């Protein structure tokens, strides 16, 4: 069961959190795909290709590190996803009010 320092996560919260993580991940990948398609259509030189490669390498590292659902960081991950617009505050209603408040506060930092 997922936990924060304040309160344990219920099974329903845990399942909903995983579902929202998957949804946010897919949103990010969809956006990345659109960006890459647009950039790829503009490639005219080999330097453009290497820039796209560097961009993709950096994005892969960023994305691989972002979607971490370990108990110790899950609140922070949701705050980051909220800050980046990959999840909306309304999508966090499956969480207890104290957890929602903490995520929203962290997203404002």
Swiss-Prot record:
This protein's name: Fluorescence recovery protein
Top-level division of the source organism's lineage: Bacteria
A GO CC term attached to the entry: plasma membrane-derived thylakoid membrane
UniProt subcellular location: Cellular thylakoid membrane
Transferase as UniProt keyword: no
Reported impact of residue 50 to F: About 75% conversion of OCP-R to OCP-O
Species this chain originates from: Synechocystis sp. (strain ATCC 27184 / PCC 6803 / Kazusa)
Pfam families named among the record's database cross-references: FRP
This protein's UniProt keywords: Membrane, Thylakoid
Protein encoded by which gene: frp
Subunit comment: Probably a dimer, interacts with the C-terminal domain of OCP-R.
Result, substituting residue 53 to L: About 50% conversion of OCP-R to OCP-O
Topology versus the membrane: Peripheral membrane protein
